[in-house]
From Swiss-Prot:
InterPro entries named among the record's database cross-references: Trimer_LpxA-like_sf
Keyword terms of this UniProt record: Bacterial microcompartment, Carbon dioxide fixation, Carboxysome, Photosynthesis
Any one GO biological process: carbon fixation
Motif mapping: Encapsulation peptide: 219-241
GO cellular component, as recorded: carboxysome
Protein's gene: ccmN
Keyword presence, Secreted: no
Location relative to the cell: Carboxysome
Comp. bias intervals (Polar residues): 185-195
An example Gene Ontology molecular-function term: structural constituent of carboxysome shell
Family in the record: Belongs to the CcmN family.
Lineage per the UniProt record: Bacteria, Bacillati, Cyanobacteriota, Cyanophyceae, Synechococcales
Biased composition (Low complexity): 196-206
Subunit: Interacts with full-length and the N-terminal 249 residues of CcmM; a probable CcmM-CcaA-CcmN complex can also be isolated. Interacts with CcmK.
Annotated protein name in UniProt: Carboxysome assembly protein CcmN
Amino acid sequence: MQLPPVHSVSLSEYFVSGNVIIHETAVIAPGVILEAAPDCQITIEAGVCIGLGSVISAHAGDVKIQEQTAIAPGCLVIGPVTIGATACLGSRSTVFQQDIDAQVLIPPGSLLMNRVADVQTVGASSPTTDSVTEKKSPSTANPIAPIPSPWDNEPPAKGTDSPSDQAKESIARQSRPSTAEAAEQISSNRSPGESTPTAPTVVTTAPLVSEEVQEKPPVVGQVYINQLLLTLFPERRYFSS
């Protein structure tokens, strides 16, 4: 891969910020930035050569560049980093919290990064995640009780009647007067001279109805009214369902 050329820097001096120690025999090109964060230090030993436009930053640790080290133009070094003696760092390379051994040649455009330090930095910058998980953990001790399913209870069998249907049937039976009682009441209400007409014989058969009709409660006093109409008007043979 062909790297773009390093642009010239208009500044004739390099920039220094923080605790930076530079040996008098070191050579630093214009436009170089040396920046050390609080409680951090940058040490450049004898014979070190830093190319045009490179940036060296000490963050969360010290940066130490040992003697006779060559850093090509356009490099980025973020500490803590230790570069061994007589090592060579190619142009436009990036070093992030990764040490370089002595007499090592790094090709141009390389990326050297300490993944363990990167993970620790990310974990330290997000403490709210641990607090959220700690707050959520007590809720798991008291889980929510499951809602019972309506299909767990089996429906009653078709042949059995519910208690409400049995109560309705018993009330209907008690409210029905018998045929003999209805005849006695009618005969007592007539005078002695009147002849009592004979009531036709009525044969009742159990109607074949569906289960839905049987479940309906009968009308109170319906049988009594039918017997009374048969007695008063035998010629019409009135039947009422």
